[in-house]
Amino acid sequence: MNKAKFPTTPLGRIKLFFTLFDSRWEDLTKENWIKIIYKDFSAGLIVAMTAIPMAMGFAMAMGMRPEHGIIAGALACIVGRTFGGSKYQVYGPTAAFIPVIAALIAKYSDPANGGTFEQAHGFLVLVSIISGIILIIMGIFGVGKYAKLVPNSIIVGFTIGIAVSIALTNFEDILGIENFKEFLGQDEDIHGGFFHNLYLAFGNLGVVNIWSVFLGLLTFVLAKYLLKISIYIPGPVIAMGTATFLAATLLADKNIILVRDLYGSIPNNFFKLQMPFLPAMNGSVVLDIVYFVVGIVFVSGVESVLCSSMADRLAKNDRTPFNPDKEFFGQGLVQIITPLVQGFPCTGALARTATSIKAGATTPLAGYFKAILKLLMAFYLAQYLELIPMACIGGILVWVASNMIKPSEI
């Protein structure tokens, strides 16, 4: 890989940050533009089909609505591809953000504390904007390169913890229990005590919906193994479609819980402004702002740099490598803009980036195609997305969790 000559002063970096057609487009030439556009379009289509069920699942795991994941993934990819520092990176919702965002939404939407979902979402917008400003400043002053210095053991431990958390807190969707909290008892934590909850569930199989468990396991198996056959087989989409078809036909009378049962209809008018919200200030709110801002900055900064580095290696990029400082700048804009339009914080997505590269992505065009195709598919399929079984969403999330743990890295 060539030694990159990136600016070394804040002013030089700012100038580069607003240079939209930079070295990321160096592979697009007059001689090969038709071939490049075709390859990028194909990669964008494959990733868009894979990303829709994942985006919906991540959003619901965070306490958000399904459509929030769709708009967040599309808008983050457009902003990140325009202002980021990587040729190949695909931006969108990631599992690493689930614990951070879920904790914020749960706390500030709790009616017992006088909260509402709108207030919680507005507070998320506020802390995300603060995080974005910090990331931009870090990029301007050349801090991006230091994200590479985070020890691998910390990254692996952090990733494993998130994977375990996702798996343990989403299995109730697979069990198909209509009111999980009543089933456990009011004194139980609906998202805690996994082995106790599992013991209760399988000790009361008459309450567990076996057909829901079947759909969850079927989704997991199809998503996991179809992609191993070929990246051109969109395993998650086929899994989602199969589970939805079965729930609407052969299992229509089996009381399968659907997305619309919990969230109502999914609108296709995605773009709505979500203004920031600041709760009444006290010591607890100040600490929460600091806590969530640090979490968002750490996750978005470190994961985006790691993803960009992985992308260069996977693509065997022997020309200009990614620019970590510009990546921080792009991440900052992602965190500022995306939550304002019914979204939430996003970052570089390792699995979707790898899929995009393997499918032939060469320039940032692949990210634009992914975003546009994702929005178009969601717009025309919104009425069908609400028919997806919640067990299918649980199966998708458990599949994501299983992919996050690599025994060779432990």
Give residue ranges: language-model regions.
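Transmembrane helical cores of multi-pass ion-transport proteins
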Residues: 2-410
